[in-house]
Amino acid sequence: MLQYNTWTIEQQEWNPAEELAIEQQLTFSNDYLCQTAHFEEYYSGAQRLCTYIKGIDTSILNLSAISVRLADERLDLHVWRVEQFYRCLHKNQPLLERHVTVTSPKGHTLKIVARRQLLMDKKECMRLEYEVQSLNYAGPITILSILSTGEDAEQWYPLMNYVGDDLCWTWMQLQPANMQVCSAMNYSLTKNGSPVTQRPIKVEKQDVIGFSMTQKVVPNDTLLLRKHVIVVDSQRFAKEQLIDEALRCLTNL
């Protein structure tokens, strides 16, 4: 059940049977980018990983994608027991906020806080803050910050991918239309407020690019991932300028 207010839409209870419908009802936009309210982390239940650009009716990449793993378990709200759940769309920002406490089949409990925003002053930018706190787990936590294929992956052809030390980008073309999009991403990770400086493992596949980072935690430790993604397209820029423009926007955040 959703609660509608002047500037917010709130969800107080977790109902997996209604998740797909609620994701669509909480769709948000900054008049250039538009996203459904799908979970950032992996979810094995029904969902639509949709991000749209103004003027293109085909979903592009899953810009907000991440993955969270413990030593031998993967965070998945469809499988884990949801102890507490709250989600709120702040329509005037636009910002999607989610607070979740979950317990794995092996009894490990995590507290998740996710804040995903489509910027109004830089409309080509999506910003994500994703916080993972261990409540009773001691061991490694691996977080992947990635760009992955979305709902309409078969309609996009990858032209070029790049994964550096702290940023990555992908350049794609829509088939059969002659439309091109470049998406660039950077990230940072902190543990209990201190920057994590170890070099990540690069992830570079045809349908997924990004970074994998592992930290050992004890109960009450908190990892915070900050992720920025820039999207530019050939409706607004010359195709040969897309990569440079995406990197320029990312640098100027």
Language-model segments: which ranges?
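Acidic/polar, glycine-enriched structural segments that form the non-catalytic walls/loops
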Residues: M1-Q24, Y32, A37-H38, Y43, ...
